[in-house]
Design a protein with these regions (language model features):
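Short hydrophobic/Thr-rich beta-strand motif most characteristic of the beta2 strand and flanking loop
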Residues: 25-33, 40, 105
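Conserved acidic carboxylate
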Residues: 8
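Hydrophobic/aromatic residues positioned on beta-strands within the core alpha/beta folds
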Residues: 79-81
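The feature encodes the CheY-like receiver
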Residues: 56
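C-terminal output helix
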Residues: 85-86, 106-122
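Acidic catalytic/metal-coordinating carboxylates
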Residues: 33, 59-65
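Two-component/phosphorelay signaling modules centered on CheY-like receiver
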Residues: 11-29
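Active-site residues of response regulator receiver
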Residues: 52
């Protein structure tokens, strides 16, 4: 089964991502802060990551640096309330560091957008 690791400090958003991902066949681990996220990543690398750029204890760019240093191979979906320019720049930064940035979504995110994003990931993530 495909594994998704979510890091989002907004429980309602994390639940929505989890629900849609499960419906798309993912086994999901939800984390709400950077420490939980890093612990879950060390426990076993997922096939995909849903990453919020705005966390209380660390920003998403620092998490992208951490993922690059860890040589993470997961497909990364960046989801944030920042504007499109910030999302695009973050995606390019991740790619420049060797990460597999699968896409970006701006909050508030709709279920249909999430479903489409996970279906696109399915084409590249083996079951």
């Amino acid at each position: 089964m495909k594994r998704l690791l979510i890091v989002d400090d907004e429980p309602a958003i994390a639940r929505l991502i989890q629900k849609i991902a499960k419906g798309c066949g993912y086994e999901v681990t939800v984390t709400h802060d950077a420490d939980q996220f890093m612990d879950a990543l060390v426990a076993g690398e997922p096939d995909a990551i849903a990453l919020d750029l705005s966390l209380p204890s660390i920003d998403g760019v620092e998490l992208l640096r951490f993922l690059a240093a860890a040589r993470c191979r997961a497909k990364i979906l960046i989801i944030s309330g920042f504007d499109a320019r910030v999302l695009e720049t973050s995606g390019r930064l991740g790619e420049a560091r060797g990460l597999n940035i699968a896409g970006t979504l701006m909050k508030p995110v709709r279920a249909a957008e999430l479903r489409a994003a996970f279906e696109a990931l399915d084409a590249a993530v083996p079951a």
